[in-house]
Protein backbone atom coordinates (compact mmCIF):
# COMPACT_ATOMS: atom_id res chain seq x y z
CA UNK A 1 0.00 0.00 0.00
CA UNK A 2 1.27 3.46 -0.84
CA UNK A 3 2.32 5.64 2.07
CA UNK A 4 2.48 9.42 1.63
CA UNK A 5 5.91 10.97 2.11
CA UNK A 6 4.49 14.22 3.51
CA UNK A 7 1.27 15.30 5.14
CA UNK A 8 -1.32 16.62 2.70
CA UNK A 9 -3.20 19.80 3.59
CA UNK A 10 -6.94 19.68 4.11
CA UNK A 11 -7.53 21.93 1.07
CA UNK A 12 -5.51 19.64 -1.19
CA UNK A 13 -7.23 16.56 0.19
CA UNK A 14 -10.67 18.01 -0.45
CA UNK A 15 -9.67 19.19 -3.93
CA UNK A 16 -8.45 15.70 -4.81
CA UNK A 17 -11.56 14.02 -3.44
CA UNK A 18 -13.89 16.44 -5.23
CA UNK A 19 -12.79 15.06 -8.60
CA UNK A 20 -15.04 12.01 -8.07
CA UNK A 21 -18.41 12.63 -9.65
CA UNK A 22 -21.54 10.50 -9.69
CA UNK A 23 -22.79 9.37 -13.09
CA UNK A 24 -26.37 9.71 -14.26
CA UNK A 25 -28.43 6.57 -13.89
CA UNK A 26 -28.95 4.81 -17.22
CA UNK A 27 -32.67 4.58 -17.96
CA UNK A 28 -34.28 1.75 -19.86
CA UNK A 29 -37.57 1.91 -21.77
CA UNK A 30 -40.11 -0.61 -20.50
CA UNK A 31 -43.75 -1.11 -21.42
CA UNK A 32 -45.90 -1.49 -18.31
CA UNK A 33 -49.72 -1.59 -18.41
CA UNK A 34 -49.68 -0.41 -22.02
CA UNK A 35 -47.59 2.70 -21.43
CA UNK A 36 -43.90 3.12 -22.15
CA UNK A 37 -41.84 4.48 -19.28
CA UNK A 38 -38.13 5.00 -18.69
CA UNK A 39 -36.89 3.61 -15.40
CA UNK A 40 -33.52 2.53 -13.97
CA UNK A 41 -32.52 -0.98 -15.01
CA UNK A 42 -32.35 -2.28 -11.46
CA UNK A 43 -36.06 -1.47 -10.98
CA UNK A 44 -37.38 -3.08 -14.18
CA UNK A 45 -38.33 -6.40 -12.63
CA UNK A 46 -39.89 -4.78 -9.56
CA UNK A 47 -41.94 -2.46 -11.79
CA UNK A 48 -43.16 -5.35 -13.92
CA UNK A 49 -44.23 -7.25 -10.80
CA UNK A 50 -46.06 -4.17 -9.49
CA UNK A 51 -43.83 -3.69 -6.45
CA UNK A 52 -42.83 -0.14 -7.49
CA UNK A 53 -45.13 2.65 -8.62
CA UNK A 54 -44.00 3.81 -12.05
CA UNK A 55 -45.65 7.25 -11.85
CA UNK A 56 -42.84 8.57 -9.64
CA UNK A 57 -40.35 8.26 -12.50
Curated annotation (Swiss-Prot):
Query: What family does this chain come from, according to its entry?
Result: Belongs to the bacterial ribosomal protein bL32 family.
Q: Where is the signal peptide?
A: none
Stored HAMAP family: Ribosomal_bL32 (MF_00340)
Q: Which GO terms describe its cellular component?
A: large ribosomal subunit
Write the lineage as a comma-separated list. Answer: Bacteria, Bacillati, Actinomycetota, Actinomycetes, Mycobacteriales
Which is an annotated GO molecular function term of this record? Answer: structural constituent of ribosome
Domain of life per record: Bacteria
Question: What are the UniProt keywords, alphabetically?
Answer: Ribonucleoprotein, Ribosomal protein
- Asked whether the keyword Thylakoid is assigned, the reply is no
Q: Name one Pfam family in it.
A: Ribosomal_L32p
Q: Which residues cross the membrane?
A: none
Q: Which GO terms describe its biological process?
A: translation
The name of this protein is Large ribosomal subunit protein bL32
Amino acid sequence: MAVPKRRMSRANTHARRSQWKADNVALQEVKINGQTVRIPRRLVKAAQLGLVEVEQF
